[in-house]
Amino acid sequence: DALENVKIQSGRITGVTDNDSEQTVTLSPALSTTSYSVMLTPVIPTGGIGTNAPIIGIKSGSKTITEFIISIQNNGTTPNIDEIEWLVIKP
């Protein structure tokens, strides 16, 4: 059955810093290929965020079978995004 072959991993990155940064997500166990989808959800602080919303995405060329890199740009200063939830689905 095809559904039995679907692999899902999830987690949360904490301690995202102000301004520009990169966070590496380690996949364990490793996936069989780099053909997987990543969903990122920034966790908004209780008081909201500043006037400039940060840009959050996957760093180009960073997806491997064991990791990928989240790039955070323009994160501003407090309050800012300090956590990101991630979900990986490999069909």
PLM segments and residue spans:
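Extracellular receptor-binding modules and their adjoining Ser/Thr/Gly/Asp/Asn-rich linkers
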Residues: 1-37, 42-48, 54-91
